[in-house]
């Protein structure tokens, strides 16, 4: 009885107080200012909404056309609804031994920030002079949207209802098999799930 009393009347107010007293705009502006950067991805170049598959493909094809010396596109398979799953390879040919790094984004269709973030990352690697020498040291493989069908309808799951993030061992979804094969073929030394 004393424990319940303690929980209800002591801990509960402590947990609720921050909800009733939100952070001031002054503090937010001081410690979390808007970044002073230009984001050249499809979602940030339109009025609302996230990047759609067709917009992403146009963006990727434009990047490839402008940087064909360092990036190429392959399709590693199809989604359950027949959309091609893109994988980009970034490499500057030189004699250096390089670390192979694999990025995967958009595994959960209702988490669009991962695809938006990876598109920004792609733009920065190819267009920001600060990162010019990065491809002298690493070879990148990037799948920017793994769960295309789920992403298109803002749904966490693939078309067959599976969570692709829970299907790495059973490989029941068509997309999971494609992702596994692409990852294995690339022989990455570092893997990042841009989640």
Residue ranges of model-derived segments:
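M14 metallocarboxypeptidase catalytic domain recognition
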Residues: 4-5, 16-195
């Amino acid at each position: 009885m004393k424990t319940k009393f303690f929980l209800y009347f002591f801990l509960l107010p402590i947990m609720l107080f921050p909800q009733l007293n939100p952070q001031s705009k002054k503090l937010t502006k001081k410690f979390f200012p808007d970044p002073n950067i230009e984001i050249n991805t499809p979602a940030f170049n339109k009025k609302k909404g996230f990047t759609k598959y067709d917009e992403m493909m146009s963006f990727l094809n434009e990047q490839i056309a402008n940087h064909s010396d360092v990036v190429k596109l392959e399709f590693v398979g199809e989604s359950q609804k027949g959309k091609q799953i893109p994988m980009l390879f970034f490499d500057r040919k030189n004699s250096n031994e390089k670390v192979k790094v694999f990025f995967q984004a958009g595994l959960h269709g209702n988490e669009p920030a991962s695809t938006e973030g990876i598109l920004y990352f792609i733009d920065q690697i190819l267009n920001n002079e600060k990162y010019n020498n990065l491809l002298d040291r690493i070879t990148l493989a990037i799948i920017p949207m793994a769960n295309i069908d789920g992403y298109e309808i803002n749904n966490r799951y693939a078309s067959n209802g599976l969570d692709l993030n829970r299907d790495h061992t059973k490989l029941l979804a068509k997309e999971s098999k494609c992702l596994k094969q692409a990852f294995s073929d690339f022989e990455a030394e570092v893997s990042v799930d841009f989640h």
